[in-house]
């Protein structure tokens, strides 16, 4: 399988680094995501769910805990400060897994507009109510449904987070920015998981040294 402009999937060759089993990393390219999202009715709940997951890289529990009050529409910001769990058949909203998970993410203008359109369809939507009142199993079933419908390779909900990162790396985003966006506790965690996706900079270094001769 060809990944972006690479001749082969780098995940197949990478060795285990730290705690991350990086050789099992699965993700969609932007083209695969485009194919997937095209199979979902625009402005529907499912459409917005997967748009938020792909374009922000937030975790499944963070998505399911989102409320309208978490969005700063004037600043195009999304505040991540809670997570959702289903415990003993009860919905539980709790603090995120680590202090670093509490963060603010810049979102693209088109995503903000999609959120506004969705809320507009549900007139009087309470600011503090869960935006997507579903459980994780339902989300997983919907993912499988659209994967089958569109024919894209099957991945997990969490792999959409990996897809977001892979796209950022392809666009040249630095590891520190990705670390902050994902809410990782340190840069090493980010590099252990995604470092193999970064192209080698050795040739660029050699060219720089040549120019300094």
Regions flagged by a language model, labelled:
Residues 51, 55, 61-62, 145-149, ...:
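C-terminal catalytic core of tyrosine-transesterase DNA break-rejoin enzymes
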Residues 6-66, 73-74, 110:
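Basic, Lys/Arg- and aromatic-enriched nucleic-acid-binding interface segment
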Residues 16, 32, 65-117:
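Conserved tyrosine-mediated DNA breakage-rejoining catalytic core shared by Y-recombinases
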Residues 31, 108-153:
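Active-site/catalytic core of tyrosine-dependent DNA strand-transfer enzymes
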Residues 22, 46, 74, 101, ...:
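Exposed loop/turn and edge beta-strand positions of beta-sandwich/beta-sheet ligand-binding modules
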Residues 35, 41, 89-95, 192-213:
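DNA/chromatin major-groove-contacting recognition/catalytic segments
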Residues 2-8, 22, 133-137, 153-159:
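N-terminal core-binding DNA-recognition domain of tyrosine site-specific recombinases/integrases
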Residues 1-10, 73, 82, 120-125:
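Proline-centered turn/helix-capping motifs that create local helix->coil transitions or kinks
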